[in-house]
């Protein structure tokens, strides 16, 4: 689960990390009022969406008056912000963050991620702040410094000092960096995070370190332990179909093709998409209904898949282990009937009672094509939709 910048900065502040004074506002009038409350003669206003690249898209601006801040808010509130990280529709802007302007002498990069290879939290830092870290990793990987955190002892100040010296920090900056480093590590573990990113971590004109931006991703599997964090979720920033799927414990990811895929098992789902692509088709989604492929879940899965106007056909690929294929077939028939599916549906059943399941599909009298094999299923659905999207 992603957090907005203003939410991430509040968590930073709770852990004693240096962030700008700011307020998340809902109206242009509130933006102007909060700018006056903050004081000063310059402010930064930022559209709040779960996407990077806001600055280049016009979603971040330096303003000189509260009236200019209000005008920025009026321009963006209720609108869609399109960046290189969003789709063509962008993401809705419902809040504007107005905060103090910080004078920047130098930009650095600092982040922490859960590295599955080492099974530890790994910090990454670089002198190349304010830019896309993926670009830095690809073009100049030697500029990225790393430190693994031992889960038994936690982040140690000596690790922070070692990175600080390599970043060229000196004097009070070394201790400030150590405080930020240890604070972020504690926040990461305390809140079960998957990612923290400070880009940029800046050196101000007075020589102090300051977290100018903040990005946090929370491990969704741990949200039950953090109701306070779960309450920060903003459903408007999520794909509507993915949100509905999550409510039914369905794993759904929208793609750009025209063949809807419904499969039980993540590995089989990925293999299904690969084979569809190999046969000249284009998957419209990844959808894993899991082991409990009940009629209700299958029905909801059909609704989610068919809510995509690009879908011209559906491939259902089920391997029956504990779950009987004949019961799954009944669920598919009931779902197709209830949803009123009008596009071709190709079903491949394999495993427990597969023959009986295929027989029920054939006798249903509905527009359901029972495939003879995995390969046949992919060929049939690609043929049914007329080839690639």
From Swiss-Prot:
Its EC number is 6.2.1.5. One of its GO terms (cellular component) is cytosol. Residues 9-244 form the ATP-grasp domain. It is an enzyme of class 6 (ligase). GO terms for molecular function: ATP binding; magnesium ion binding; succinate-CoA ligase (ADP-forming) activity; succinate-CoA ligase (GDP-forming) activity. InterPro entries: ATP-grasp, ATP-grasp_succ-CoA_synth-type, ATP_grasp_subdomain_1, Succ-CoA_synthase_bsu_CS, SUCC_ACL_C, Succ_CoA_ligase-like_bsu, Succinyl-CoA_synth-like. Keywords: ATP-binding, Ligase, Magnesium, Metal-binding, Nucleotide-binding, Tricarboxylic acid cycle. It comes from the Bacteria. Binds 1 Mg(2+) ion per subunit. One of its GO terms (biological process) is succinyl-CoA metabolic process. It catalyses: succinate + ATP + CoA = succinyl-CoA + ADP + phosphate; GTP + succinate + CoA = succinyl-CoA + GDP + phosphate. Mg(2+) binds at residues 199, 213. Pathway: Carbohydrate metabolism; tricarboxylic acid cycle; succinate from succinyl-CoA (ligase route): step 1/1. ATP binds at residues 46, 53-55, 99, 102, 107. Heterotetramer of two alpha and two beta subunits. Belongs to the succinate/malate CoA ligase beta subunit family. NCBIfam families: PRK00696.1 (NF001913), sucCoAbeta (TIGR01016). Succinyl-CoA synthetase functions in the citric acid cycle (TCA), coupling the hydrolysis of succinyl-CoA to the synthesis of either ATP or GTP and thus represents the only step of substrate-level phosphorylation in the TCA. The beta subunit provides nucleotide specificity of the enzyme and binds the substrate succinate, while the binding sites for coenzyme A and phosphate are found in the alpha subunit. This is Succinate--CoA ligase [ADP-forming] subunit beta. It comes from Alcanivorax borkumensis (strain ATCC 700651 / DSM 11573 / NCIMB 13689 / SK2).
């Amino acid at each position: 689960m992603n957090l907005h910048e203003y939410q991430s900065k509040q968590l930073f502040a709770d852990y004693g990390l240096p962030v700008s004074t700011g307020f998340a506002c809902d109206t242009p009038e509130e933006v102007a009022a909060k700018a006056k409350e903050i004081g000063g003669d310059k402010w930064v206003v930022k559209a709040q969406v779960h996407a990077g690249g806001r600055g280049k898209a016009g979603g971040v601006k330096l303003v000189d008056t509260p009236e200019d801040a209000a005008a920025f808010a009026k321009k963006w509130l209720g609108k869609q912000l399109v960046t290189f990280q969003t789709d063509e529709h962008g993401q809705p802007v419902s809040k504007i963050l107005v905060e103090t302007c910080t004078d920047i002498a130098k930009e650095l990069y600092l982040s922490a991620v859960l590295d599955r290879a080492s099974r530890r939290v790994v910090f990454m830092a670089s002198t190349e702040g304010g830019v896309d870290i993926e670009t830095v990793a690809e073009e100049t990987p030697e500029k990225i410094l790393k430190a693994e955190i031992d889960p038994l002892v936690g982040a140690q100040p000596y690790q922070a000092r070692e990175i600080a010296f390599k970043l060229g920090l000196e004097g009070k900056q070394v201790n400030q960096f150590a405080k930020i480093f240890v604070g972020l590590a504690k926040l990461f573990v305390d809140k079960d995070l998957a990612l923290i990113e400070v880009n940029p971590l800046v050196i101000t004109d007075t020589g102090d370190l300051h977290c100018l931006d903040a990005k946090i991703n929370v491990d969704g599997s741990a949200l039950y332990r953090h109701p306070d964090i779960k309450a920060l979720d903003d459903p408007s920033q999520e794909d509507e179909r993915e949100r509905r799927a999550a409510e039914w414990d369905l794993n759904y990811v929208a793609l750009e093709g025209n063949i809807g895929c419904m499969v039980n098992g993540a590995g089989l789902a990925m293999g299904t998409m690969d084979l569809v692509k190999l046969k000249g088709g284009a998957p419209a989604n990844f959808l894993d209904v899991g082991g409990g492929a009940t009629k209700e879940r299958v029905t909801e899965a059909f609704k989610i898949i068919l809510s995509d106007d690009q879908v011209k056909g559906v491939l259902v690929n089920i391997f029956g282990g504990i779950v009987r294929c004949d019961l799954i077939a009944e669920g598919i028939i009931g779902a197709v009937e209830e949803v009123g599916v009008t596009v071709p549906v190709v079903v491949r059943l394999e495993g427990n009672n597969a023959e009986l399941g295929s027989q029920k599909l054939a006798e249903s009298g509905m527009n359901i094509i029972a495939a003879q094999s995995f390969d046949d299923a992919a060929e049939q659905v690609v043929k049914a939709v007329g080839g690639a999207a």
